[in-house]
From Swiss-Prot:
The lineage of its organism: Bacteria, Pseudomonadati, Spirochaetota, Spirochaetia, Spirochaetales. One of its GO terms (cellular component) is cytoplasm. InterPro entries: Elong-fact-P_C, NA-bd_OB-fold, Rib_uL2_dom2, Transl_elong_fac_P/YeiP, Transl_elong_KOW-like, Transl_elong_P/YeiP_cen, Transl_elongation_fac_P, Translation_prot_SH3-like_sf. GO terms for biological process: peptide biosynthetic process. Belongs to the elongation factor P family. One of its GO terms (molecular function) is translation elongation factor activity. This is Elongation factor P. CDD domains: S1_EF-P_repeat_1, S1_EF-P_repeat_2. Pfam families: EFP, EFP_N, Elong-fact-P_C. Pathway: Protein biosynthesis; polypeptide chain elongation. It comes from the Bacteria. The gene is efp. Involved in peptide bond synthesis. Stimulates efficient translation and peptide-bond synthesis on native or reconstituted 70S ribosomes in vitro. Probably functions indirectly by altering the affinity of the ribosome for aminoacyl-tRNA, thus increasing their reactivity as acceptors for peptidyl transferase. NCBIfam families: efp, PRK00529.1. The keyword Cytoplasm applies.
Length: 192
C-alpha cells in the first residue's frame, strides 16, 4: 500500500478510506485563488456498493491499495455458502452470503462449472466479477397470448439458475438467451 497525494489520484484508482476499499468513480480538481487546490472525489465502496463523496485539500494524502483478480470455477452453493475453486492453486474458496451484499446479488447469475473472476483485497474476496451479458437456458415460460398490443408484449421466463426475467413472446423452453448482469433484463436470444 502506498500513500498518494490528492492531486495524483485518478479516476479508476483504488483507495483505502476509513479501512474500507473504494474505487474512484469521478475526480474533479479545482484551484481557488487564495484557498488552494481542492480535489472532489466520488467513491464507490467495494464491499457494500455505497457511493460517497470526499473532498481533499491539495496537501492531503490517501492510501492507494492494490486490488487483484483470481480466476475461479464456481462449484456449488451449500446453504449460505458459495464454493469456488481457485484455478491456479486448486484450493477451495468459500464465500459466506451473510458477510456481503455483493455476493447475494450475484447468486442468480452463477452457474456450476463456469469460471468467474474473484476480486481480492488483502487476501479476502470482496466481489465476484460477472460478464456484462450471461447466457442461460430457458427452463420455464409463462403462458402468453399474442394479441393487439401497442407496445412490445413480454412474458416471464425462468432460467436454469432460477432467475426470472421478462422476455418477448417468441422465447420458448429450451431456448438460450443472454441476460444483462447489471440490469437483470433480457438482452437477446442466442441463435443455435
Amino acid at each position: 500500500m502506498a500513500v498518494v497525494k490528492s492531486s495524483e489520484i485518478e479516476k479508476g484508482s483504488f483507495l483505502l478510506i476509513k479501512g474500507t476499499p473504494h474505487i474512484v468513480l469521478e475526480r474533479e480538481f479545482s484551484k481557488t485563488g487564495r484557498g488552494g487546490a481542492i480535489v472532489r472525489l466520488k467513491l464507490k465502496n467495494l464491499k457494500n456498493k455505497f457511493v460517497i463523496r470526499e473532498t481533499l485539500k491539495g496537501a492531503d494524502t490517501a492510501e492507494a491499495i492494490e486490488i487483484y483478480e483470481v480466476s475461479a470455477q464456481y462449484l456449488y452453493k451449500d446453504k449460505d455458502v458459495l464454493v469456488f475453486m481457485d484455478l491456479e492453486t486448486y484450493d477451495q474458496v468459500s464465500l459466506d452470503l451473510k458477510e456481503s451484499a455483493n455476493f447475494q446479488d450475484k447468486v442468480p447469475f452463477l452457474q456450476e462449472s463456469e469460471t468467474y473472476a474473484l476480486i481480492m483485497f488483502d487476501n479476502v474476496v470482496i466481489d465476484i466479477k460477472l460478464a456484462p451479458k450471461i447466457a442461460f437456458e430457458v427452463v420455464e415460460v409463462e403462458a402468453a397470448v399474442k394479441g393487439d398490443t401497442v407496445t412490445n408484449a413480454m412474458k416471464n421466463i425462468t432460467l436454469n439458475t432460477g432467475l426470472v426475467v421478462k422476455a418477448p413472446l417468441f422465447i420458448n423452453v429450451g431456448d438460450k438467451v443472454l441476460v444483462n448482469s447489471e440490469t437483470k433484463e433480457y438482452a437477446e436470444r442466442i441463435k443455435s
